[in-house]
């Protein structure tokens, strides 16, 4: 699934163009938009590549997906209950845990429980403002520094420009109003 297809899927799912770009910007930072991405620091520890891990979880030969602590997928889901929910969502859909469309659907489903975040993504007209909300209230990485905020908003802005064909410059990229 291309970046543009992901963008269009999220817009069709109810996000504004800015909101879709913001969410994909965060996924770019987390996984490089690779839905089969196993957290790099766990590949050696678990003895798996992105593909072998995905296949082992899908076929049931690896049963510790929920609790192994490894980030996985577009959002690098890590916490055990979120990974269990992702796995269950994939199973119910009859899809691989690494299926990008399933993961985007899961993200939209999961975001419905984050009222402030989903509202920001549906109504966003500013990349930076919505990006900070996603960072602080949904992704919640350990590093929420200004440098990280600017970088993630920058990814969102680049994706917005590529996917819409506009060359919008975010005036508030470096400072939050």
Placement of each model-derived feature along the sequence:
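Short acidic/histidine-centered micro-motifs embedded in hydrophobic/aromatic stretches
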Residues: 25-29, 40, 133, 137
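Non-catalytic cell-wall polysaccharide-engagement segments
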Residues: 83-177
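Peptidoglycan-targeting cell-wall enzymes and recognition modules
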Residues: 1-5, 31-122
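Export/targeting segments at the very N-terminus of extracytoplasmic proteins
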Residues: 1-33
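Solvent-exposed, non-transmembrane amphipathic alpha-helical segments
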Residues: 26, 43-47, 150, 154
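Residue-level detector of well-ordered alpha-helical segments, enriched
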Residues: 18-23, 73, 103, 130
